Amino acid sequence: PDHVSCVYIRQGEPLGLGHAILQAKTVIGDDSFAVVLADDLIDSKKGVLKQMAEQYVDINSSIVSVQKIEKKDSIHYGMIDTDPSDGNMRKLTGIVEKPSPADSPSNFGVVGRYIFSNQILSFLETIGFGAGNEIQLTDAIKKMIATQPVFAYEFEGARYDCGDKLGYIKANIEYALKDKKFGRELLSYLKEKAL
């Protein structure tokens, strides 16, 4: 859209997601901002970022997107703890980076979409290096939770982990099946291979 401008900033060295966000500090300034991790592809009627932005307007607090995952997979995610709620929006009470299944506070994992107030930057600047000798976004979120509300949003849509080879293949198949030109032919091929 005409009213949107994109700026790309390279992270000079792989020092974690928190470090990557800090590279954009001068561009972010005093604004709220979104973080989108490209390896999390989410297929939904209404874009997840749009869903989250609508929530942000209502609550004016930082939001992380979450999805129910199998506890055995908690070692791959930031796992959250929240106030009890029946809705898709929950107030965070804790977050742990890649815990063992036994130590996971819930079955909700954080997945690749965030909207933050610029205050997250001050937490990122002061937390130092965490797990993997990286600046961990989850550590900054944990500090933020102690001073202001942060919410978890269980989005509507199907997520594909394109950082995983099988997840990448599944995403390509799902999107190809929806394609008007190739979908039917691909479905016939897959059925033939399944027999």
Regions found by a protein language model. Name each.
Residues 22-26, 77-82, 110-111, 166-170:
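Short, surface-exposed amphipathic charged segments that create phosphate/polyanion-binding patches used
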Residues 1-79, 125-127:
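Conserved beta-loop-beta/alpha segment of the NTase-like Rossmann-fold superfamily
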Residues 11, 67, 82, 97-98, ...:
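Active-site donor-binding loop signature of nucleotide-sugar glycosyltransferases
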Residues 34, 54-57, 86-188:
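Catalytic-core segments of class I nucleotidyltransferases/pyrophosphorylases
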Residues 190-192:
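N-terminus-biased detector of the onset of the functional/mature region
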